[in-house]
Amino acid sequence: SINSEKFSYDVIGQLGINEKSSIFSANNLERAGYERRWGKSQSFIKSVGIDQDQDILKTKISPQSDIITEIVSGANRLKDEKIIEAALGDVQGGKEGLASDTPRLIRGSSLHTIAHGGTSITLAKLIAIRERFAQQEIPESTKKIVVLSAKQESALFGISQYNSFDFNHTKPLATGVISEFMGLTLVRSEKLTKTGSNRNCIAFAAGSLMLATGRSRKTDISVRKDKQGFPLQIYFEENYGALRISEQGVIKVECTES
């Protein structure tokens, strides 16, 4: 959790292990490598008014629960958007997170980008995702997620191996469900950005991105006595910030999309 507009996260670098050369030899004490990363927390609010004569009579006796459900759904979509921004955006580093500190970049890196090649999502791109994660020594046990748009999700059905029961323990054509393939968890989001005719899909290893929450979620239903008709007010507020904490675990997957 976070309690300010700016928050930091200390990342520990990879640590190797040394061969024991002899008995009773002195320990070679090494300092673990730390890297501090900085994120920004923001507050997001929604306030909805309900006229107790007009709105309630026209819709239903108690629309409050449905409105709250819609507000929470909108809040979750915004969280997805912020996580996607953090996945491919610049990350400020340094002890104090000053503007003069060199930001950590991911864009333009061939190691962390799979070029579109004029195609949508393909078997070759999925294989490349697995290969990049392996090159970065991401453990096999770590969950790996690929975020696709609806059109890219549809393109999966054109991959024969994806639809074959020999390669996939589910039946995508029968169920219409995109879940897992080649050890990758496939999820859909319409918040992925687009550059020209290419959709910037994202693959990431669990633990490479974080969503830090600030103050506890506020929800309140009250009567606004300062307004004519004493309408009900539904108020919602959340505070959070997203941050990429590892370049090694994030890959931009460019996919052509008309």
Regions found by a protein language model. Give the residues of each.
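Sequence/fold signature of self-assembling virion shell proteins
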Residues: 3-15, 34-41, 58, 103-121, ...
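Short, solvent-exposed loop/turn elements at domain surfaces
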Residues: 16-20
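Short Gly/aromatic-enriched secondary-structure transition segments
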Residues: 22-29
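Alpha-helical scaffold segments that mediate packing/assembly in large oligomeric complexes
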Residues: 54-132, 252-258
